[in-house]
Amino acid sequence: MLLTSIAPKIISISEATWRKAAANHSQRIRHLLQPGLTPIEHDINGGKRKRRQQHHYVDDWTALDPVNPIYNFLIEYYGLKGAKGPRRLARWSPDPKLLLGDHINTDDNCKDASSVLSSSVDNGQLYKAAMKASHGLGGIVLENATLDDLGGTLHMRGAVPLPLGEEESDQLHGILYNPAVFYNRHIPLDNNNDDESNQEDRKLQLLKTIAPFQWYTSILKSTLNSDPILHCYGLHEWAMQYWPEGADPPPSAKYQSSLNLRVSRQVINDTVERKGVRCTHVDALRFFAPAAGPLNHHGASLQRMDQLRLEQKGCVHAHMDLLKIGLKLQGFIDSELMVDILEIALAARKLDVEASPYDATGYGAGVVPIETNEGRKMYRDRQVELMLRVEPVRRRLLDAYEVFMKIAFDESLLLRSDEFVGGGGGKRAAVDDDGPYVAPERLAKAEPGGLPWRKNLIEQS
């Protein structure tokens, strides 16, 4: 964890520079999503067609296809529903790492065209407006950005408008981003104006806010330090369809219901039973058929905290989940990194689908027949290739989390948070931890055919 203090500064990015970077980002996102986007005539876009007919401004983003097996995970797993989903991915924001000054790793154009402002420079009015709006914490200013840019071109989360005058106005110097401003770091934890009870309440609320970020930091660290498991062969998809004689129908039998199975039920059963399942992904277990649970070498019932020891760098679903982890930082993460993460997630999903028992060839997917020796070798080769490709992206995401938390939160809270999410000194949190705050979802369990995490909490004595 980075622990040095950050001197407040105003970083200004010229309008031409940030608009070019934002346009390039949107184009890259569109290129990646285009095969999965629905045409405007699709029923799912009915609301957008109506607004267009009423001559309201409507951008040209449409919803992802909910039956496209390569893209529908973005909807089902990560909530990128409707046209709002792709639009969310297409929004741009500057890299907070600019605020650290040294060793900037961001869009080269933004780095070269940005400048550090002080009250003595010609643009003193912009400096004063930015310092006032940021409560003296500074930030990154996108020159001449407007309110109309928010929600379309730029992220709304964390955006601070800088009015031209003393009063609030639609006329702006630009828009400022700084996670420290968004999380009220300008209010000291030892504020003398607050009584002791109010201070403790605020600390607890901040710990609740920090907990998910610290959790994902721990997951990224533990995954990077893990040994890969390269003999799982994507059998989680097969375990979802496992249906031996006398067993109840698998609850996930309707999953990917628009696709036909490319193999028989008997082949599915034989493949799952051959050597069992070696699935380390705790989120996948809940979708297993109940009969497949005992066949998992890592357990038929897992706790969320088990993710810290089980998540490993060979897991295709762990690669996909980098998108979930990155989305938590949107507004405060390098947009170039988000595109790279999306590209990785889609590549992982394609391998996931191609190795499944479904026939997805109608959507441009190939077949990795893991029910055969040749197919298992093919899967392993692809898995290793993808793992090596993901490694630097996962490291960049971990760095983005550490930079974000360094800027956004008081260091003493980060140290306290480290103690109970497994990130400090190798300590692994348990159900009976006496830490100051543990999110309820961390104290939950997953079982085949079981309830969602938040509805399956571990009973504590």
Indicate where each model-derived feature is located.
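A contiguous catalytic/ligand-binding core that recognizes phosphate-bearing ligands
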Residues: 178-305
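Active-site acidic/histidine clusters and adjacent loop/turn architecture
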Residues: 2-219, 363-426, 432-454
